[in-house]
Amino acid sequence: MGVFWYPAEMTPSWNNMIRCMLFMVFFAAAGSCTAEELEKNLGLQLEANPPMQVIARTPPEPDIPAGDFETREGYQLITSLDEFRQVIKKDGQKIRLKPGIYRVKTPDEQHEGKQHLFAVHGSNNRFDLRGTVIETPVSAQSLLTTKAHVSSCWRVYGSENTFIGGYFRNVLDKPYPKYRVADNEFEILGDKNRFYDCTFVIQGSVPYGYTDFFGKGAGGGGGRLDKHSCMAVVNADGNRVEHCKIYQHSFGHAIHLHSVDGFLAKDCFISGVLRPTNDIFKEKAGRAKEFDFKIQYRGVRPIPRDEMIPLTESGIRTYEKVRDVFIKDTIVERMRGCYALYGVGKIHLENATAREAGDFAFAITSRSTGKATMKDCHADLAYNPVFNFTRGELPVRNDYEITIHDPPEDSSPTPRTGLGVICGDKCHFVIHDATTKPLPRGFDRLVCGDKNRPLTRSEVINQTTATVVLEKNVENCVIRSRGPVIDQGRRNRVIKIRSREATKKRGSRE
């Protein structure tokens, strides 16, 4: 497929229009609006506050056929949500759900202490959902338990099911914050399930608008925390998400993996939400005002000014015992960590793009028992670092290749803008330069080594003009750089590269 930096539907002019929005309109709204025409979404913020300033992309409208529709040979036509709830519990079917909009109102039957709106117990099914919209409103989610890790809108127990063309969206039919949401829209517990050409519109979480300033998982001291992720894959192997779009507009992950052996995301687009921290100080009521505009998570301190924060968690995130993850031809934008993959086995990214990262673009590591590889990947220098190798296992014998692109025309660097931090042992880093203008002075730095995480016996090829800083724990490395190098380490070899062409040729992995 090749590099797709700005596909036709994601042109810079479209991005600029979205940036002009003072707040996200209801997702059902169509067409463009001026700032004056936009109103607060009271499902996402308190009425007492001014419209929240965000950078977000409006999800596309679903394509629902007005007349005839296709039912493929061998498929059973289902015309109601009640029927659909029953057939997803059976095996070996081909089901066609009649196009239209369906809204669930009540929970499904509990199973093994778990609560959900839909329970897919069946296996070896094909669900043709083209032209259908299945809505899970917060009013229905509020009927589920408030216990952590117990509720999901959809729980897929079965294996080898295929979901084709579905449009799944949350509806904010209660005012913020007078609702509760399920932990995940989808929780996948079976093996070898596949989502193809599906769209997920995820919204609704409490609090909203502050990233993790008031908590994230255990240990938060900032009051009630009700997160909502799109998809969790738990103790399940060989699942696939292909040609799908996720609009993650709530505080939660787009996709998170736990104890997984084999996962593929291919030709996907994941879009989150950003907010300038200066906008928080305009609030008259709510969580920030209650805590005197101070962060309550991992220490009490003032909310920083002049930064850009994500209102979501990570795009694709791994947790314990994850191996054999393959990400290809995928774009993640405006998420906290676009790709946060910490594996015990193989982690491979190919043509994976990160844009306008909310905290960092890439944190890719694997233990010495596996290998992490980034091939032909892409990122910009909009607001936050490209690399964050300060967490997870220290990379060993991993390969990283990335191309740096221009940020959006109307973006401005923040105090956190830069190439970030890399660490590892016997690793190979190649950083290509596709920018058309100089990197912002003062924000053009790549730091090698971090506190107790060294960079040793590695090669770094820096094609950009960024300054490479070698910390004291950088040893026995070869640094080929177009930009300046500050060497505070030991026994390193620094080689000046005079043009980006020379770097590209030398750094080629072909």
Regions found by a protein language model. Name each.
Residues 97, 127-129, 158, 162-165, ...:
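All-beta strand scaffolds that present successive hydrophobic residues in beta-strands
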Residues 68-79, 86-110, 126-131:
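Glycine-rich repeat segments that build the extracellular carbohydrate-interaction surface of secreted
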Residues 20-30:
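Bacterial N-terminal signal peptides
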Residues 106-108, 136-142, 172-184, 200, ...:
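Short glycine/acidic-rich loop motifs that flank beta-strands on beta-rich extracellular proteins
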Residues 37-83:
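Right-handed parallel beta-helix/beta-solenoid
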Residues 6, 12-17:
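Short, positively charged and aromatic/hydrophobic N-terminal segments
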Residues 33-35:
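Boundary at the C-terminal end of the N-terminal hydrophobic targeting segment
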Residues 85-90, 103-126, 135-164, 170-194, ...:
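Extracellular beta-strand-rich solenoid/capping regions of secreted or surface-exposed proteins
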